[in-house]
């Protein structure tokens, strides 16, 4: 618990990224540069170079463990932060995790704000890459 709370301020947004992809890495760096927040990345493996990142904390969930373990890990993570005044922002960073989130959205929405497709594209590629009508809508 202390490991998580040291980097989280009351009232802050906590990005929770699913999958270690180039989009996840760029999203974590962008969130850190723009807002000063550390992203929590749930993934199946952690490359050595990524372990040195100052803007990401990793939670390793073996891919062979299946969906239920990932959902349980997310639930436990949210429960650890349950009494804090935080917004847990769940961002799936590949198609597999996007499908997982959509399939279990009802359960996950109790604890997380879930990015929709337009939000994911803005977060992954930056607001400047999204069409103007989507950004201003």
Feature map (PLM): residue ranges:
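Conserved N-proximal alpha/beta basic substrate-recognition cap immediately N-terminal to
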Residues: 51-137
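Nucleotide-activated donor-dependent transferases that construct or modify glycoconjugates
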Residues: 2-20
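Short, polar loop motifs at secondary-structure junctions
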Residues: 42-49
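A generic structural motif
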Residues: 35-39, 112-114
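Flexible, charged surface loops at secondary-structure boundaries
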Residues: 6-12, 33, 81-85
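Residues at the starts of beta-strands that form the adenosine-phosphate
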Residues: 14, 37-40, 87
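Glycine-rich adenosine-cofactor-binding loop
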Residues: 15-31
């Amino acid at each position: 618990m202390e490991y998580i709370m040291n980097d989280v301020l009351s009232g802050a947004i906590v990005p929770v990224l699913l999958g270690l992809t180039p989009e996840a890495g760029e999203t974590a760096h962008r969130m850190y540069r723009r807002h000063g927040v550390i992203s929590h990345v749930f993934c199946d493996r952690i490359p050595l170079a990524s372990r040195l990142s100052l803007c990401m904390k990793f939670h390793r969930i073996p891919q062979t463990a299946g969906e239920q373990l990932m959902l349980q890990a997310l639930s436990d993570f949210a429960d650890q932060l349950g009494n804090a005044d935080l917004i847990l922002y769940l961002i799936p960073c590949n198609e597999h995790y996007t499908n997982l989130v959509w399939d279990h959205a009802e359960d996950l929405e109790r604890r997380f704000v879930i990015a929709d497709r337009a939000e994911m594209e803005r977060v992954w590629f930056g607001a400047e890459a999204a069409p103007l009508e989507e950004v201003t809508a």
